[in-house]
Amino acid sequence: MEIQKIREIVSCMDPSVIITESEAFQAEEDGNEYQVWKLTTASTPLVLKKTNYPEQETYEGFFPHGGPVPKVYGFHEGWMLMEYIPGHTLSRCCREDLILALNALIASQRQYWNREDMSGIGYGFEKSYPNLRKRLSYMEDLTTCYEAYLDAFRSVPRTLCNDDLLPFNVVISGKRAVFLDWEYGGILPYPCALARMIAFGEEKENALFFMKREDQTYAVEYYYEHLIRDMGIPYGEYIRTMKLFFFKEYSEWIYCANESGDFSGEYYRKYSIMARKLAKDLGYS
């Protein structure tokens, strides 16, 4: 987008901002450009992002006074102006960064635990569940396990989750963890965010998301000890629930392949194996 158009959009939110340069962000997974720009200004750098109404609702409803999110300076006709967060993502995970992310997640989820009065804000259960239910017919021989996941999705306690909290949506800035891209944020089953954040971590150095197996295990245990235990959920029940939500993350690639008719992708081959392994572990072989 031309810088003059960017200036026009930003001026509708803050006429005092003087933009000197703009640079489009690129996606970590494929290098394509987002509709997100880093703006160099006469003072502090900013970010302009193309957004949607659920994301705007989430920022305004859950973070009016801040939180593990960028500070927002304004919205205008599908655009959001916010602070630029320097740092690095969780895509090359280390234990220190993981703890920062877990603490930020736990604090926000504790604040909004069982807040059903806020369920209509953003992309909560009422919007998410029907779309997940539609995937059932694409689950090949894994429908029974997927039905068990749907049962858990309906029944477990809910809290604030970013249901797209992939590692590149977690920025570590000093001693602060910041969560980005809240298009799929709202009051959802509690495991959604953690499962999304750690399910795809691999120990291969060239992996899209590098995370040691011991750190994945550590995250599951840390989350229980610092939040879920306090909510009265038995450990065994928690572990089974987390496995179902990990299964959902892997089965997403089965859905994508069957919905598109394209079974040639590496992710389909890899994650269908992992989904079946988890289903067997859960007793749905």
Label each region the model flagged:
Residues 1-17, 268-285:
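Regulatory N- and C-terminal appendages and interdomain linkers associated
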Residues 32, 43-80, 91-107:
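A conserved alpha-helical element in kinase catalytic cores
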Residues 83:
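Conserved Hanks-type protein kinase catalytic core
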